[in-house]
Amino acid sequence: MVNIRPDEISNVIRTRIEQYNQEVKVVNTGTVPQVGDGIARIYGLDKVMAGELVKFEDGTVGIAPNSESDNVGVVLMGDGLTIQEGSSVKATGQIAQIPVSEAYLGRVVNALAQPIDGKGKIPASESRLIESPAPGIISRRSVYEPMQTGLIAIDSMIPIGRGQRELIIGDRQTGKTAVATDTILNQKGQDVICIYVAIGQKASSVAQVVNTFEERGALKYTIVVTENANSPATLQYLAPYTGAALAEYFMYRKQHTLIVYDDLSKQAQAYRQMSLLLRRPPGREAYPGDVFYLHSRLLERAAKSNSQLGEGSMTAPPIIETQAGDVSAYIPTNVISITDGQIFLSADLFNAGIRPAINVGISVSRVGSAAQIRAMKQVAGKLKLELAQFAELEAFAQFASDLDKATQNQLARGQRLRELLKQSQSAPLGVEEQVATIHTGVNGYSDILETGQVKKFLVQLREYLPTNKPQFAEIIRSTKIFTEEAENILKEAIREHSELFSSRESK
């Protein structure tokens, strides 16, 4: 017979009573009556915040943008194939946020800032909300520093400043991504953190861009955020905000950042898909009523911080794709009205072999010469005027048979200036090379050449300068002024190179 010791039993009971925790844990839960097309309807999930994260039984996470009288509409961050009708859902009490750190540089991540490049986990000690409020008026200062793109047409006539939002707009296959990636390549050694956000692109296109960055040594100062065409609409919609949160992390640490959104047309389409599935009322072109706010709250996060916040900056060139050059469509007009200028890329110019295919006549930067160094201002003013006059004359010359000598000369100069703006892809130019190129063109040094020889002559001149006249680049870089000494050195270099060029060509 087992001996029962009352003192042991009483000790066990006493210990259990002391360990009893009276704390009641309240969990906000609901059930799934309906799921499909990346949308779940949740019944019984009371007191859920707008945009709160919710977690399903199978581990899938969703965002709750719609709170209705009898249910909550949730968009899923995944395919949701394992979510079953009647399964439970738990509110997390958190708004969507991502981890941030310096370790993200050189990595490829998705819209949830999770690495997808196979290089292992990214260490991060802090996090930021995906949707942060934009800096206020007092937190900003006016844009005054240039963000060099390395493209003559932009840096001379449509200059972009640090903290500006300059739209890149054009039809498909007109070189929009090339302009953006060249700008990122040109930031090498400029102490600028770059973020490339690819929304709804083909995986092969994104891989090509990443390879270009890696080959040219640009990946070490760049973060690539990508959600491909086969990603859920929710993640395509979130990707730009994730990129902005990463850029803000560096901006508020007194650094300069450049974030490219490629492209916001696809983000708007993903948002339209989400909204229609959530049964929100459609508006113009079936977009929901708040599609303007979708882009304005994203682009307003780009800023040039004031001195109290460390003078960091976030420059945002968004890309918009037009259909058959129609810039009066809903999304293009929205983004044009939000941004500080636009660069129009023309399919006609692209097909005519003028690349980058920038239509200088209708492109504009609302910051203007405030975002140029003095040396560029000195040479660029004449270029824009001469190209504008050439465009008018060219249209007139199509109908006139006999033109006087002055008009013929002006047309010849204009054709050579247009050649001067042509550049190969992934070959951005330093500001001193641009100043030399523009000065050569606007002062008529290329007028004696055949139109087809101009590009070759200028490429060889840019190669000749660093080896034979290195002091020219030193003066421009150190003083940022096109001084008389620099002009004399350049004139001498042009004269010497012209003799070499003509002797080579005559052979």
Swiss-Prot record:
Q: How does it sit in the membrane?
A: Peripheral membrane protein
MF term (GO), any? ADP binding
Entry-linked Gene3D superfamilies: 2.40.30.20, ATP synthase alpha/beta chain, C-terminal domain, P-loop containing nucleotide triphosphate hydrolases
* Cell compartments where the protein resides: Plastid membrane
Catalytic reaction list: ATP + H2O + 4 H(+)(in) = ADP + phosphate + 5 H(+)(out)
Where is the major localization of this protein?
plastid
Q: Which GO terms describe its cellular component?
A: plastid membrane; proton-transporting ATP synthase complex
What are the protein's UniProt keywords? ATP synthesis, ATP-binding, CF(1), Hydrogen ion transport, Ion transport, Membrane, Nucleotide-binding, Plastid, Translocase, Transport
Residues the record lists as binding ATP: G170, D171, R172, Q173, T174, G175, K176, T177
- Disulfide bond among keywords: no
Alphabetical list of InterPro entries matching this protein? ATP_synth_asu-like_sf, ATP_synth_asu_C, ATP_synth_asu_C_sf, ATP_synth_F1_a_nt-bd_dom, ATP_synth_F1_asu, ATPase_a/bsu_AS, ATPase_F1/V1/A1_a/bsu_N, ATPase_F1/V1/A1_a/bsu_N_sf
Lineage top rank: taxon: Eukaryota
Do you know which PROSITE patterns this protein is assigned to? ATPASE_ALPHA_BETA
Record site: Required for activity: S363
* Pfam families, A to Z: ATP-synt_ab, ATP-synt_ab_C, ATP-synt_ab_N
| EC numbers | 7.1.2.2
Residue ranges annotated as transmembrane are none
Entry similarity comment = Belongs to the ATPase alpha/beta chains family.
Q: How does it assemble?
A: F-type ATPases have 2 components, CF(1) - the catalytic core - and CF(0) - the membrane proton channel. CF(1) has five subunits: alpha(3), beta(3), gamma(1), delta(1), epsilon(1). CF(0) has four main subunits: a, b, b' and c.
Q: What does this protein's UniProt record list under function?
A: Produces ATP from ADP in the presence of a proton gradient across the membrane. The alpha chain is a regulatory subunit.
Supply the name of the protein.
Answer: ATP synthase subunit alpha, plastid
